Amino acid sequence: MAADALRISSSSSGSLVCNLNGSQRRPVLLPLSHRATFLGLPPRASSSSISSSIPQFLGTSRIGLGSSKLSQKKKQFSVFAAAEAEAKRAVPLKDYRNIGIMAHIDAGKTTTTERILYYTGRNYKIGEVHEGTATMDWMEQEQERGITITSAATTTFWDKHRINIIDTPGHVDFTLEVERALRVLDGAICLFDSVAGVEPQSETVWRQADKYGVPRICFVNKMDRLGANFFRTRDMIVTNLGAKPLVLQIPIGAEDVFKGVVDLVRMKAIVWSGEELGAKFSYEDIPEDLEDLAQEYRAAMMELIVDLDDEVMENYLEGVEPDEATVKRLVRKGTITGKFVPILCGSAFKNKGVQPLLDAVVDYLPSPVEVPPMNGTDPENPEITIIRKPDDDEPFAGLAFKIMSDPFVGSLTFVRVYSGKISAGSYVLNANKGKKERIGRLLEMHANSREDVKVALTGDIIALAGLKDTITGETLSDPENPVVLERMDFPDPVIKVAIEPKTKADIDKMATGLIKLAQEDPSFHFSRDEEMNQTVIEGMGELHLEIIVDRLKREFKVEANVGAPQVNYRESISKIAEVKYTHKKQSGGQGQFADITVRFEPLEAGSGYEFKSEIKGGAVPREYIPGVMKGLEECMSTGVLAGFPVVDVRACLVDGSYHDVDSSVLAFQLAARGAFREGMRKAGPRMLEPIMRVEVVTPEEHLGDVIGDLNSRRGQINSFGDKPGGLKVVDSLVPLAEMFQYVSTLRGMTKGRASYTMQLAKFDVVPQHIQNQLSSKDQEVAA
């Protein structure tokens, strides 16, 4: 057991030696006035002790009698007032690492995180995903299914560095969790299955990391599996991701004879004995059969890194190789600037390769001071740019990136602190809404467990309790120095189902549950369809909505009936159309009059909706134009064909006229609605449907059946590929409407031996016969 591996003994010199999991640590002797460290974890200046007073627990703060007298102007906390005494750092900001672990589903993210927590002393036993005991997979649904559903945060320490880790899901239905984690992280570990190589969701998370400019290192995992091939995976990183890999390790053996790795920086072999759960390893000479290969990859590494320093380059050309410290400095520089991506390898499940991975996080990924400062805007004037540097003395600025409901604490708001500091009991400004919020408690999270802290400093990832109006993507700032940071983009749902409680008594409980779940997950929407008298929930896939319904049952005690899944279609136009519409009403008293000419233009896919005013000479007074805008925007949620949202359309207000007495904002709003109905019908309306990229991995003997089935689902086969073990890979595009219950069909067709992944590729035009069916259904409902 891991707990048995802790031994404290006295050496001959009289000093204490702490042996944790096979590695010796010499604790720092502190004066008695300091709190002792536990298992090498440094104390945090902001941590509250168990003996905290009740007022401290509730989030208030006491100011000693010896302090200067309070100003009588305001007796409310500022962002900094209560934080000053607690603002001393236990770990310098340059030694912080805020990282995420991202990959395709089943690449080993959570398993790797569990090993990291064990070897750093954060956990004292290893949790396993397949046993449902992984610390980071704390939800019941995660433990039952063996997958990560929600991103989980924790903090640990390695080599005097503080590492804040977010473990993210790999399933495409939960890609939002990856998106918002990457938005607030400084670096990432991208895992790859050494057998499967680069998989579809690997490409998705890689693009997300590119979007936010996140430096990353690659870890080729599962080197112990049958068919493991480090070098093929390295080649796929080049061809599939367009990355420039920098190989820092090569494996010693593979599959069941995988023993360790060759460290190309030190030019030593690192070998794990298998004792003490992988905590024990040794540095040895490189095996003879790998010496030539190691020299070859070492030379390739040197050629890449010496380009970053002219002096080192000159010395290298003269035959002088850089020392280890210089190599690490240059690898770090190239990683942070995105010149290349370091690649390491190992087997997290077999406890091999994790400690060098932790060293690489410390050595090569950036601290908060090494990433560009955060740019924001003035809430009063978005044209003014405000820069927030990563410094405790800067005004506080943080981004809320996740909301979580806690049964004991209530709503928790996860915040990345980009500058300044905050304390429990202080006030912050929600800069997006202009509302002040009071922080009840500050909590440092470890999966779903929590620890009260008194202050959060720059670089921290912290949970705030007590916020009522803040949602994901909003900025919290110092009330005296407001700033709005860039918001996050959230994907639109692609699937929906009708849901209703089994008993009328649960109607209110279901509404409460849906509201809380929608606050947590911006990719989940719900609405009430009054015509059909039913509630509709929308999400990113069948699994996503299945989890939502399951959470309603477990967390909110609501038993629900769920209808068949429905696709979220879109409507658009295919040509330019211009319409003149006059709204005129006279029924005694003041009448209504508005006359407008609107041109509707199709836009490129993904452009959304745009409004443009081309009014000249006051044909439509400026005060009435917002009425036209509002009228058109309201109509964009309900198209003319089947009532689906309208996308990729520009509406231009070209001309119009008004009446001095009878015209009003409302009249122009009603005219805009009429112009929309007429204009859309003239502009060649068409329906769009979500097209999914579907990758099927199947034994070769079932390949024909799989292809035939995909073709019958209106699928388009893009390419074929091979995988070890006689497996074939089919890459295709299939409409989402044809993919419901596909997993059951695939299992039956291949005797359970095939698997598939699916992710949104694009929206495309619906065939006319299907469009006619959808339109007729809408007309039947309307009738």
Swiss-Prot record:
Annotated Gene Ontology cellular component terms: apoplast; chloroplast; chloroplast envelope; chloroplast stroma; mitochondrion; nucleus
CDD domains, sorted: EF-G, EFG_III, EFG_mtEFG1_IV, EFG_mtEFG_C, EFG_mtEFG_II
Pathway named in the protein's UniProt entry: Protein biosynthesis; polypeptide chain elongation
Binding-site residues for GTP, renumbered to this chain: 103-110, 167-171, 221-224
This protein's record includes keyword Signal: no
Ranges for domain tr-type G: 94-369
Claim: Ribosomal protein is one of the keywords in the record: no
The name this protein goes by in its record: Elongation factor G, chloroplastic
